């Protein structure tokens, strides 16, 4: 189940929301898009990237037309991935991008931390969730110690996004994936 928790920078809980419509409304206030998608055809558990793209093509095309995305792909992360620890550490540092960061969770989950102002928004994304983080928004991502997800990603440039780290240690002050998901 998707869940948004909003904290002060010092860690005081302000709001805790589980209703997808309310999550979308709250995130819209900081220009973050949150939607729930459904495939236009049933997907097998071992669906190919092409089958996944085709199942969500109507939604992908809608976002391409609205935001001018130039490319998209499917990324998978499993507990067996040889670089999972290295990638987790990279994503756990607060950063920005000059491009949108768009993820649709086909299956599995992950936690986005958004820090656009004097608050921290912790969003646990689950299968069926789309999040679009606007350019230059401070954020970080935690996929957990044993990641298991498949996502569609969309980009406005063919080379995708490049992280620009802020140097802040704020990510160390908030709960990691395991505590967010199990807490």
Swiss-Prot record:
Note whether Iron occurs among the keywords.
yes
GO MF, one term, reads: nickel cation binding
Which cofactor does the UniProt annotation name?
Fe(2+); Ni(2+)
One Pfam family this chain carries?
ARD
Q: How is the cofactor bound?
A: Binds 1 Fe(2+) cation per monomer.
Site (Important to generate the dianion) residue list: 103
Identify the residues that bind Fe(2+). 95, 97, 101, 139
- Which SUPFAM superfamilies has this protein been placed in? RmlC-like cupins
* CDD domains tied to this protein: cupin_ARD (cd02232)
Is DNA-binding found in the keyword set?
A: no
UniProt catalytic activity? 1,2-dihydroxy-5-(methylsulfanyl)pent-1-en-3-one + O2 = 3-(methylsulfanyl)propanoate + CO + formate + 2 H(+); 1,2-dihydroxy-5-(methylsulfanyl)pent-1-en-3-one + O2 = 4-methylsulfanyl-2-oxobutanoate + formate + 2 H(+)
Q: InterPro entries per the record?
A: ARD, ARD_bac, RmlC-like_jellyroll, RmlC_Cupin_sf
EC assignment: the record states 1.13.11.54, 1.13.11.53
Record keywords: Amino-acid biosynthesis, Dioxygenase, Iron, Metal-binding, Methionine biosynthesis, Nickel, Oxidoreductase
Sites marked May play a role in metal incorporation in vivo: 94
Where does this protein hold Ni(2+)? 95, 97, 101, 139
Q: Which family does it belong to?
A: Belongs to the acireductone dioxygenase (ARD) family.
Function, in words = Catalyzes 2 different reactions between oxygen and the acireductone 1,2-dihydroxy-3-keto-5-methylthiopentene (DHK-MTPene) depending upon the metal bound in the active site. Fe-containing acireductone dioxygenase (Fe-ARD) produces formate and 2-keto-4-methylthiobutyrate (KMTB), the alpha-ketoacid precursor of methionine in the methionine recycle pathway. Ni-containing acireductone dioxygenase (Ni-ARD) produces methylthiopropionate, carbon monoxide and formate, and does not lie on the methionine recycle pathway.
Assembly description: Monomer.
Query: What's the protein here called?
Result: Acireductone dioxygenase
Q: Which organism is it from?
A: Aquifex aeolicus (strain VF5)
Q: What is the lineage of its organism?
A: Bacteria, Pseudomonadati, Aquificota, Aquificia, Aquificales
